[in-house]
């Protein structure tokens, strides 16, 4: 049975967006790959000279739906962060506005990507939430994240060749 599944490389997609987006470039955003929330925190701690981040988690949550059209859903998390002076709430607010605008611009590209992906039977959930993290999550850094759910067809037909004789 063919194990190659249709997939979408969220990491490569957002790395490309960070490189091509004029706003991200002007604001000094750097791209990095992390492993979950812990990896995001570690990136913030170790990359002290970087002022703004777009981090895509290489981990995903998901499930398989056993319906008439079986599909696999994977949820990718993208973290955004921007440093500011500690205890400066005005600076934090300004950074959060920057993160919101970057999210908006990313979504304008994701609409186009969604149409392209549907031609390959890869479906992005239209509901993409933007979540701002508490000011105490990481001192001196405005942080937010959003998640994208990606659905792909999953072939669940029984194949006797995959099993030992019973």
Locate predicted features:
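Extracellular/virion structural assembly segments
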Residues: 1-12, 67-73, 81-108
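Small/polar-rich, solvent-exposed N-terminal microdomains that initiate assembly or binding
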Residues: 1-68, 161-166
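Acidic-leaning, charged glycine-interspersed low-complexity segments
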Residues: 18, 22-26, 49-51, 96-151
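Short, cysteine-centered beta-strand-loop-beta hairpins and adjacent loop/turn segments enriched
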Residues: 63-64, 83-88, 153-159
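Oligomerization/assembly interface segments of phage tail-like spikes and tubes
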Residues: 70-85, 140-153
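A hydrophobic membrane-anchoring alpha-helix module
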Residues: 146-166
């Amino acid at each position: 049975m063919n194990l190659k599944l249709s997939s979408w490389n969220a990491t490569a997609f957002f790395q490309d967006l960070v490189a091509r987006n004029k706003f991200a470039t002007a604001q000094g955003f750097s791209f990095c790959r992390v492993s979950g929330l812990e990896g995001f925190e570690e990136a913030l701690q170790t990359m002290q000279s970087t002022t703004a981040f777009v981090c895509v988690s290489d981990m995903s949550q998901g499930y398989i739906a056993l319906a008439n059209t079986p599909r696999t859903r994977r949820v990718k998390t993208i973290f955004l962060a921007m440093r500011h002076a500690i205890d400066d709430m005005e600076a934090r607010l300004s950074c959060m506005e920057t993160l919101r605008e970057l999210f908006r611009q990313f979504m304008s590209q994701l609409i186009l990507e969604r149409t392209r992906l549907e031609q390959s039977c890869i479906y992005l959930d239209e509901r993409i939430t933007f979540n701002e993290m508490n000011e105490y999550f990481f001192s001196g850094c405005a942080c937010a994240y959003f998640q994208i759910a990606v659905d792909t067809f999953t072939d669940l037909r029984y194949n006797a060749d995959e099993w030992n004789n019973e």
